[in-house]
Amino acid sequence: MLAITQEQLDAVVREAYDHAHACCHYAPTDRSFPVGEDGKMDCTGLMLRALWWAGYVDRAMNCDEADQLMGDLGFVKSTDINDVYTHHGFVQWCEPHNVGTEHVNHTYYSLGGDGRTISKYDTGSDPRIDAVQPYVGVPVDEWGGTLVFKHMWILPEAPDKGIYLKVGD
């Protein structure tokens, strides 16, 4: 088990966003490794680059593979949309026709919020990558129903020892 605190995860997500902001452009599928090394970063790339810097990712993967990885690493999957307001973590959305499948259409990192809006880091388009982030005061359903909440990956808490991710068996 490799330990990582919530503050450390927030910091590596910030570093991944700063990397994207400084030198990357959007690509629908970023299959480079390390993620973003080719100057491209999709929305899942933010998650993968952060996890690579934290030592949990060792290869390029697509969005669906990354979603499976989160469970394998020991993140807790929450299907309660209210957790987006109260927790930090990777939030995943899908198009309505993908509900009930494993497919994910968009990923961002939530920093929690006030019950109406959240703050977040988000890549996946040049305007997002070029923006000053974290975004603050964003409505959770900013897509007006074109995307629906799928789930959120949250770090499990370990009493008195920070937060741990499961790596390997």
What are the roles of these predicted feature ranges?
Residues 1, 163-169:
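Viral virion structural and adsorption modules
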Residues 6, 10-13, 48, 56-149, ...:
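...with weaker cross-activation on analogous glycine-rich loops/strands in unrelated enzymes
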Residues 11-41:
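Active-site nucleophile-His-acid catalytic modules used for acyl/amide transfer and hydrolysis
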Residues 18-21, 52, 56:
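Short helix-capping and hinge/turn segments at secondary-structure transitions, especially at repeat
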Residues 21-23, 30, 89, 113, ...:
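Generic alpha-helical secondary structure signal
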Residues 28, 151-156, 167:
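Surface-exposed beta-strand edges and flanking loops
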Residues 35-54:
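Active-site nucleophilic cysteine motif
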